[in-house]
Every structure is written in C-alpha cells, then in structure tokens.
C-alpha cells in the first residue's frame, strides 16, 4: 500500500496478517506459523507466570517509550519467576491489544524492547496473539525451569533474617521525576540518584543475579527451603505477604530500611521506600547462617529485620505496627 510521505502506518491499515508477518523477525523461524508453541519436554519442573501491563495503570507514554514498555513487560514476569526459584528462562508469549489507530512504530518499539530484555536475561519469544481494543494492553506469559531452591512465601520461620536484594523507592522516585512532580522539585536530588531512579522505572532489572548468588551461598547441609517474594507491589506489601503466608510477625528496623546512598530523609521518602512499588527486588526470609553468607556474598543486599512468632503483621523494632500510607501505596485497582 502506498503511503503519503510522513504519514504513519497504523494497525487498522496493516491488518492482522501483515502485523503477524512483521512480528516474525522477533521469533525463531517458523515459530509463528501455527496456533501453538512447541516446547521440548523438560525433566525439570516448569514454573509459569502471567502478568499484564495496562496503559495508564502500569505505564504511560508520558513517562515510558515503547521500547521501555516492552522491556518492562518482560522484566515484571521474570521477576516473578526469579522469586519462585527460576533456573533457566524458556521464553514468553505475548498477548497484545491496542486501538486500530495505533501506529505500527509503537508496536515495533514494544517488541524491540521485548527482544532486548530476552537477549539479556534469556529465553525466546514463543508466540502470542493480537487484537483490536480500546486500550493498549500487554499480557505476558513467561515459562522457565525451576532449580533446586524451594522458594515459597509460607517458608518463613521465627528467627529468620529478613533480607532484601537492593534499595527501594527508586522506581517511584523515577516516576516522580519524569512527571516533574513538585515534591522532587522542592529538594535537590543528586544527579546520580536521578539517573538510577529513572532507569529503575523505565528499565527494571529482575533479580536473577541475586537469586543465583542466593543459590550458590547456601550452607551445604541446609535444606533448599526459604521464603521469598518480589517487591513489585512495594516493600511493605512484600513483607506482609510473607507474614500472612507463614503466620509470623516481621520486626523491621527503621534504621535499616533499604535506601539508595543518596536517598533524602523525611516521611515522604520513607513512604516511597516502603510502598512506592515496582522495585522488583527479592525480599527473602532466611535462616541466620544462610542469611549471613548471602549478605557477605552480595554487598547490595541488606538485612532489614527478623521474623518472630506472633500474628501475621509487620512491626517496627520499637513495637509499633507499621502503618500504610494510603496515598502512596501501589495498587492495581
């Protein structure tokens, strides 16, 4: 079809078959020819996760370009696989829904980001589906093989160390910076912190390296069991989910909140650290010997508290229950 110069191709003009034909370059030869994806049989257990990214809920074109959207779609799913004991990424399928007026360049950018993330973290684009819709939506299903670690939220035990694999609040700060939020304009945020925060929001890193280190430093005679989740919905929610599943109390040391070295002080900044969301760090409850080995092997990890017998809740070390700041808590609905 001939196009006038400077006129963008839109999905309505291309049609489904041409869209699928253009997406072939992101997959292995023949992968898209059939309605199913053939995966070779594995003797190991499979772990599978499905996540959605919805425009104006999980991303905005004001703050996130198409490449970043594709990257983020992969990273969110692989983060969930990592906190379930991922050994190797097999691949993903992609369900795409978008208005027919969507430019092809947007779709191409998203799949470029998807491919870049898979190239870095492993796995292939196995297939998927596309449809016309009122809102841009990506639905990703990720598949991987499970390693020897049995990571379940219900595995936390009294006496465990509560550890996270990295700092929190960066993604929320990055979003604020991209939106020119008055909060971030009222304080001198160091340039290095700005760079880290914006990258954390636009190109999150699933905690695969942290998981691999956790695996390597397990004491020899210790069982392969630990409690873990990721902090995609915020650090506090991650801690509370471990408490609920394990029926334990988490005692958190306020002085040990996992913050970037240049993180400002103040209640708002503590709230972002606790509840900003989309940090994608491992939050793990580990027996003391294993915890100490992981802390030594990976300097970016931080012990933020202990688990003890008691009701399923998170509390400060002074005995006060950690209260949620509802205006900052990350919610899907």
Curated annotation (Swiss-Prot):
Cytoplasm recorded as keyword: no
Position of the signal peptide: none
A Pfam family per the record: AIRS
Entry EC number(s): 2.7.4.16
GO BP annotations, alphabetical order: thiamine biosynthetic process; thiamine diphosphate biosynthetic process
Positions annotated to bind Mg(2+) 2: 51, 80
PANTHER family reported for this sequence: THIAMINE-MONOPHOSPHATE KINASE (PTHR30270:SF0)
Gene from which the chain derives: thiL
Binding site for substrate: 58, 278, 330
Binding site for ATP: 111, 128-129, 153, 232
Name by which UniProt lists this protein: Thiamine-monophosphate kinase
Binding-site list for Mg(2+) 5: 233
UniProt pathway: Cofactor biosynthesis; thiamine diphosphate biosynthesis; thiamine diphosphate from thiamine phosphate: step 1/1
NCBIfam families xrefs: thiL (TIGR01379)
Transmembrane segments annotated in the record for this chain: none
Residues involved in Mg(2+) 1 binding: 50-51, 129
SUPFAM superfamilies: PurM C-terminal domain-like (SSF56042), PurM N-terminal domain-like (SSF55326)
Further comment: Reaction mechanism of ThiL seems to utilize a direct, inline transfer of the gamma-phosphate of ATP to TMP rather than a phosphorylated enzyme intermediate.
């Amino acid at each position: 079809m001939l196009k006038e110069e400077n006129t963008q191709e839109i999905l309505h003009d291309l049609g489904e078959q041409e869209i699928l034909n253009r997406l072939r370059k992101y997959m292995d030869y023949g992968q898209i020819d059939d309605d199913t994806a053939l995966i070779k049989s594995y003797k190991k257990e499979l772990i599978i996760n499905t996540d959605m990214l919805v425009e104006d809920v999980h991303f905005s074109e004001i703050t996130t370009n198409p490449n970043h959207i594709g990257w983020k779609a992969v990273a969110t799913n692989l983060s969930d696989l990592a906190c379930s004991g991922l050994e190797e990424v097999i691949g993903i399928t992609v369900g795409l829904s978008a208005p027919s007026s969507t430019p092809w360049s947007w779709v191409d950018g998203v799949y470029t980001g998807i491919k870049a993330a898979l190239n870095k973290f492993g796995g292939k684009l196995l297939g998927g589906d596309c449809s016309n819709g009122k809102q841009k939506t990506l639905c990703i299903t990720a598949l991987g093989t499970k390693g020897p670690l049995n990571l379940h939220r219900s595995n936390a035990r009294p006496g465990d160390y509560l550890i996270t694999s990295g700092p929190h609040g960066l993604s929320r700060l990055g979003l604020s910076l991209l939106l020119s939020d008055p909060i971030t304009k009222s304080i001198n945020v160091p340039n290095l912190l700005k760079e880290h925060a914006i990258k954390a929001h636009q190109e999150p890193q699933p905690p695969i390296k942290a998981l691999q280190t956790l695996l390597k430093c397990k004491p020899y005679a210790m069982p392969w069991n630990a409690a873990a989740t990721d902090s995609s919905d915020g650090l506090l929610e991650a801690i509370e989910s471990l408490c609920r599943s394990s029926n334990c109390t988490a005692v958190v040391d306020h002085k040990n909140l996992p913050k970037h070295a240049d993180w400002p002080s103040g209640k708002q900044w503590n709230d972002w650290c606790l509840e900003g969301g989309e940090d994608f760090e491992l939050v793990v409850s580990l027996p003391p010997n294993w915890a100490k080995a992981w802390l030594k092997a990976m300097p970016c990890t931080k012990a933020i508290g202990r688990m003890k017998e008691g009701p399923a809740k998170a509390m400060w070390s002074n005995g006060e229950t950690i209260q949620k700041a509802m205006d900052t808590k990350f919610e899907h609905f």
